From Swiss-Prot:
It comes from the Bacteria. One of its GO terms (cellular component) is DNA-directed RNA polymerase complex. It comes from Synechococcus sp. (strain ATCC 27144 / PCC 6301 / SAUG 1402/1) (Anacystis nidulans). InterPro entries: DNA-dir_RNA_pol_bsu_ext_1_sf, DNA-dir_RNA_pol_bsu_external_1, DNA-dir_RNA_pol_su2, DNA-dir_RNAP_su2_dom, DNA-dir_RNAP_su2_hyb_sf, RNA_pol_bsu_bac, RNA_pol_bsu_CS, RNA_pol_bsu_protrusion. One of its GO terms (biological process) is DNA-templated transcription. Residues 1064-1100 are annotated as: Disordered. DNA-dependent RNA polymerase catalyzes the transcription of DNA into RNA using the four ribonucleoside triphosphates as substrates. Keywords: DNA-directed RNA polymerase, Nucleotidyltransferase, Transcription, Transferase. The keyword Thylakoid does not apply. The lineage of its organism: Bacteria, Bacillati, Cyanobacteriota, Cyanophyceae, Synechococcales. HAMAP family: RNApol_bact_RpoB. Belongs to the RNA polymerase beta chain family. Its EC number is 2.7.7.6. This is DNA-directed RNA polymerase subunit beta. It catalyses: RNA(n) + a ribonucleoside 5'-triphosphate = RNA(n+1) + diphosphate.
Amino acid sequence: MAEQTQLAPAAFHLPDLVAIQRNSFRWFLEEGLIEELESFSPITDYTGKLELHFLGKQYKLKRPKYDVDEAKRRDGTYSVQMYVPTRLINKETGEIKEQEVFIGDLPLMTDRGTFIINGAERVIVNQIVRSPGVYYKSERDKNGRLTHNASLIPNRGAWLKFETDKNGLVWVRIDKTRKLSAQVLLKALGLSDNEIYDKLRHPEYYQKTIDKEGQFSEDEALMELYRKLRPGEPPTVSGGQQLLESRFFDPKRYDLGRVGRYKLNKKLGLNVADTVRTLTSEDILAAIDYLINLELDLGGCEVDDIDHLGNRRVRSVGELLQNQVRVGLNRLERIIRERMTVSDSDSLSPASLVNPKPLVAAIKEFFGSSQLSQFMDQTNPLAELTHKRRLSALGPGGLTRERAGFAVRDIHPSHYGRICPIETPEGPNAGLIGSLATHARVNDYGFIETPFWRVEEGRVRKDLAPVYMTADQEDDLRVAPGDVATDDAGYILGTTIPVRYRQDFTTTTPERVDYVALSPVQIISVATSLIPFLEHDDANRALMSSNMQRQAVPLLRPERPLVGTGLEPQAARDSGMVITSPVDGTISYVDATHIEVTADTGEKYGYALQKYQRSNQDTCLNQRPIVFEGDRGQRGQVIADGSATEKGELALGQNILVAYMPWEGYNYEDAILISERLVYDDVYTSIHIEKFEIEARQTKLGPEEITREIPNVGEDALRQLDENGIIRVGAWVESGDILVGKVTPKGESDQPPEEKLLRAIFGEKARDVRDNSLRVPNGEKGRVVDVRLFTREQGDELPPGANMVVRVYVAQKRKIQVGDKMAGRHGNKGIISRILPCEDMPYLPDGTPLDIVLNPLGVPSRMNVGQVFECMLGWAGQLLDARFKVTPFDEMYGAEASRLTVNAKLSEAREQTGQPWVFSDDEPGKIQVYDGRTGEPFDRPVTVGRAYMLKLVHLVDDKIHARSTGPYSLVTQQPLGGKAQQGGQRFGEMEVWALEAYGAAYILQELLTVKSDDMQGRNEALNAIVKGKAIPRPGTPESFKVLMRELQSLCLDIAVYKASTEDYEEDKEVDLMADVNQRRTPSRPTYESMSVGDIDDDDD
């Protein structure tokens, strides 16, 4: 294809998109870990004789046992061992022992920002939480009076809440306990009346509290404090003192954190040093003073908005890990203290004191089961990138879905350029999980910053470096959006400019603008920024599109879009799927699996490419070189493509010829009609790799064996297995085929009667093993691409009880078929309803058949008109042999820029091709199309173009499912649900109503009895079907018996009676449970209930 036409200056280069993960983990290694180790040092025993010091600054990490690929292959964890020099000091003898001790394994981050835990790639999602600090809020009481309160929230420790009441008294609550008078707390801190009055701007308001309560001395105040916090215990002064000390002034128990101290100083105008992380009496006085000023409404004070991003901060990997290390060290400290006390002080060494288990367990728990440690979404490079940039308000220390109201989920003006207003899940998590905007970064305090250009006298200073600002700093400035029009010198054009000022959207003159946003793309996330003509789409559809692009399956031959936004190369590069050259140099060697670059200085750099590996989502990860031997390579240039990338650009779908028209009702309700070409030419074919695993365990009756000798299996089924009973690589397998042969020893009890009979007659011991082989599940087929064998002898770590583990990888090519889900980039999704032969598809005047027919009714009501612009510009691109990069929000280049550009390009295409039908001025974008079946033209011209369509991961092959016989639920005896359990389809209450309405009584009876939970009836019915006899009358469903038992357990005398007839007068009770104890319940219907007599009957 020819070089791309630039319709807009390329968006300002984005920062490194995975930096948030990498920087955070680097901070943890350089500062966070040391900080934690030093805060626990020294640990003294209960008598104070022994001291153990951790020299945190000198900790060491040993090289990882396996590298990244090896860890994945062995199902291991990619981690390093942490060693810390420790010093044990015996105070009595003055003896000092120094030793380096092992304190645990620390999983290492890969260069792509992920962790490998037990062989699977995981991502730690960033958490967005309320920042520690002081928050003021106003509430109306039931009489409509405005009262104010303040909450002092630490990083960890007790909350302190100050409130005023209708009488103008000031109260304090400690950790949501009962109210205390504010003067009790202040006096207990040891402050005199004069000191208190000096610090308050309006002491007369506080005086009311003293008048009402009376004076307290310091001792009385401490006693009162103790009484309120520990009711029922005899109060003492020393107890009160100790309680107060430990609650607020002990750094172990109470910590504001760096951020909390910074926020407190900022809000209350204090100058307390950054290192003081506990509360001071000055803080408490200032907080009360601010509250009184709010209450008197004297200006200069305002209540806080908790949803403002200045009051919410991001906790990334480093900090989350640091908190977890603190938990582990806390447990470790307890153990060390106990060991110091119990053991003999002479024989003690640091190594015998420090047990790595608690720390290892805490870290393992965090990576293995924390809500924020997630299995990485590897469907395609974009999914991977977005996952690392995700912001979640859920998780430990965050919100819960049920408690989160509308305010928390809503878009806030301070989100501008920090959190994407569009990308969030649909459903219960909407608004709680967001995505970082493209240019946003997180500062040292954890607040999100976004860049702006400075404006001086109406001139945008793009020559200066952009200024990064937090939401707080930006509040009092007038900030214009990124798409304001400027002249060549940078002066803002126009007289009224839209700006954001103090959380409001207003207008102002160019001279009063303080800053301008860096780029129009700044406010949205990476996934959203890949939607061309985004400004013409409704936000709900843009949200669906952002989420669906992450579900696009990498195709066999990726193709980059004709119409893009210019951010595709960077998205691909930062996802880590493509390989870039580290230096300027020459490509000295290339083959399918390896690339070597020789730098100009002579150094050599080698890269091994990933070939056909399985991703977490069963898609295929594969890299292919795009350079040749002898080529020059520049630093940062892409030298190998990954899955779903082409020439270093993200390529999630295919450009195909699309028309918007109804066709015989096949595209009713968003259904999609496609041409057979997409199947034959493998346009939408993808490779999926499934993993099947089996382990040979040690059982009570002996070990299980992986073998070729499987009982009752013909030679035909074993032809693909090697001598050990394991399938060979390259074999084609279909459902039911054996992948790994395995036999399990079985005891006497689980032998069917015919085997017992044989042994009784011939006295021979039939081989007492059971076939327990790994077979291909229902509906799966493919080619075996890899087999891996793990045994203890090779030094592999196996699960307890397993002697051998075999893993088989089966790859399948999935062509597109009816039932698959497809989508465009504008939230236009649908299911394929029919695949037409090419000759029946509508065709263009030059005879080209269409690839796909979409319903035009999908556009107007959904208001995603961007798809129409895209398809027409794509059509022009194909005819002109050009690709377009269209940055969203293009009105800064003039009104209706999108429409004018598209029409101009289409008329240019008409001139170049010399085909007048390509573009008509009367009906722009519409073309006369002919019916492929009759050759007649359709009644009206149709919108035709090239759209970029994706195939999504919801494939019909993974969903289609049927059941004949299968497992039943234990209690209700009804079939289980779901494909994985080989379940049935639930015939629910409403479906029953439908059959009742039709009067289909017998079908309904069968559904509720023999097809479901009439245990005896279903076995009899199965036997009857096998023998071709009439199905007997159904019995009582098990669930009815369960219901009766439940009612009887509530002491209700409930039973079933046979109504009276002429033979006997009174009703007769029927015992439904009569046959329950006699029968042995088979988990599946069996044929054992056939008697010899039945078999004879058949021959009659």
